[in-house]
């Protein structure tokens, strides 16, 4: 896969939507519908971000197939080694756990836990996007 064919627009849009949701939530933290939408936006931004990370690593590897067999933990470590990520494996494990919790049950405490991690996650995904854009330039 050529790096110039890497489509970053889904991540750009997802980050914009998550940021917009965060701003709306901040203006009214009591609105359950806004909270639900914010969590959903977190979920799809998380999915897009780690998939784009993998595609970028594959596109710049002499052996792209190695990333198909790589664990999520090693994928994050590879992203760190290439300065694509701010967070460590521990941070991304927390994001992954947040995503997992939201997809299996709905609980107000879990929702609040997920929401509390969104600002840090937004910083992380924005950094990933900037780093990939630099490499595409």
Annotated model-derived regions:
Residues 1-137:
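Solvent-exposed interaction patches of small proteins and small membrane subunits
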